Amino acid sequence: MATVTRLCVTKSVPTVNGQFPGPKLVVREGDTLVIRVTNNINNNVTFHWHGIRQVRSGWADGPAYITQCPIRSGGSYVYRFTVTGQRGTLWWHAHFSWLRATLYGPLVILPPRGVAYPFPKPHREVPLLLGEWFNADPEAVIKQALQTGGGPNVSDAYTFNGLPGPTYNCSSSNDTFKLRVRPGKTYLLRLINAALNDELFFGVANHTLMVVQADASYVKPFAATALVISPGQTMDVLLTAAANNPPSRSFAIAVAPYTNTVGTFDNTTAVAVLEYYGAATSAAALRSLPLPSLPAYNDTGAVANFSASFRSLASAQYPARVPRTVDRHFFFAVGLGADPCQSPVNGTCQGPNNTRFAASMNNVSFVMPRTSLLQAHYQRRYNGVLAANFPAAPRTPFNYTGTPPNNTFVTHGTRVVPLSFNTTVEVVLQDTSILGAESHPLHLHGYDFYVVGTGFGNYDASNDTAKYNLVDPVQRNTISVPTAGWVAIRFVADNPGVWIMHCHLDVHLSWGLSMAWLVNDGPLPNQKLPPPPSDIPMCS
């Protein structure tokens, strides 16, 4: 724990090595990481290395009760894994309850020595973590929401590398992140959306950004003045400073929310400063810097246009290995729902019409087990732990983006999809209008996937499949299901283990918006899950 003050609120927060945000890990493609975690806080905790493929090292993936039991207070665990075939910006964070509000940091993977970037070498590289600050304890926030059945209280500020900037009350220039640049130099900004519950627009006043990478996968470079980045996603962008010192030497860097939710959200703008060397921006000047032009908070069209710009390099050195044929097709309806008010607080529940908020895929709200699914799978002890019958499509189809059905109640279960090794998979993720259509950033553990198609309205297999991009689709580990729309992804199930796929809005994850893939061993020794480490935490 460390004492941190933001917005005139001083509190003790969980940290890694006393740092908020946590320490930067810099490795090279091919390195093996050995990270010993000792839990000195009162909560259980686990850590996830977000975007690392964990090839045959699922025991190190980190989601609580999926690949391991939590590290108890006073306990420790060694995460050991090798970075295989990946380079770029990823990140690490706690994967238990809402602890990742302060337990997060960058994970930078450099190319092997002697291998250049497929874009101009930058003068400097700068990790930029976009987060949320809660004056209250985030653990108390989600606990209260789950008790009452309503939505959680929203954050009090957005942050750049843990700093909220000058636009908030009781936030000084000392709480403002400053990026100092030299004229004519190019900087690689390694953007990470570490916010708990908000997709964010990002921009730099009077500067154009060149997007070169997404989720540690190179993309065909494209220019943009406003970006959108979802929780869990990373984005590498090049910023070139003006060749000569401009008349004004300080420029606002801003983030603001993108949302279509019908509920409350943190509708504030956080500011950092791009400062040319030699400038000295006063506190008063910081507050009056012109902001970059960002889309309106609900501008889904701007988000769609930006998202459509991403294409893989698809070069000889970095090919796009898109599955052309598919062994198994899945259609997941993704959205909110409700539970009956069986445990009222003060006689009522605070969800819609005296219900409790829930979330689901194919109307199954995921129930977190009390033991590790990977351990149960390795020991083949499934009874009472999981059911291998997650539905491949909704049991009762409906007009997903039209008038919602009258019955909004969800079912519950720890249900998984079993896959044979090397199965090629296509998943269509369809947003629903139940309790309001909204974007859902879905993250798949253990894999990258290709985003082969997207659109608005209800997915139509007879027409939409023909529009797929099977040449140079972007490769990601986290993708937002468009508001009132759909997205199609493909991957090859060549990594044995149990891999959760979940919404990276933590409130939706808390309400059950997740499922898991159980990928069986292949026939060869290098296609099998190794035994668990001797120090893996036990649940009982």
UniProtKB/Swiss-Prot annotation:
GO molecular function: copper ion binding; hydroquinone:oxygen oxidoreductase activity; oxidoreductase activity
UniProt KW keywords: Apoplast, Copper, Lignin degradation, Metal-binding, Oxidoreductase, Repeat, Secreted
EC identifiers of the protein: 1.10.3.2
Positions bound to Cu cation 4: 440, 503, 508
PROSITE patterns, sorted: MULTICOPPER_OXIDASE1, MULTICOPPER_OXIDASE2
InterPro entries: Cu-oxidase-like_N, Cu-oxidase_2nd, Cu-oxidase_C, Cu-oxidase_fam, Cu_oxidase_CS, Cu_oxidase_Cu_BS, Cupredoxin, CuRO_1_LCC
Top EC class of this enzyme: oxidoreductase
Co-factor remark: Binds 4 Cu cations per monomer.
Pfam families in the cross-refs: Cu-oxidase, Cu-oxidase_2, Cu-oxidase_3
Compartments, record wording: Secreted, Extracellular space, Apoplast
UniProt binding sites for Cu cation 1: 48, 443
Binding residue positions for Cu cation 2: 50, 93, 504
Domain Plastocyanin-like: 1-114, 124-279, 389-523
CC cofactor: Cu cation
Reactions catalysed according to its record: 4 hydroquinone + O2 = 4 benzosemiquinone + 2 H2O
Residues at which Cu cation 3 binds: 95, 445, 502
Any single GO BP term: lignin catabolic process
Any one Gene Ontology cellular component term annotated for this protein: apoplast
Highest taxon of source: Eukaryota
Record-linked PANTHER family: LACCASE-11-RELATED, MULTI-COPPER OXIDASE
Protein family according to the UniProt entry: Belongs to the multicopper oxidase family.
The protein's role, per its UniProt record: Lignin degradation and detoxification of lignin-derived products.
Protein name as it appears in the record: Putative laccase-11
Organism: Oryza sativa subsp. japonica
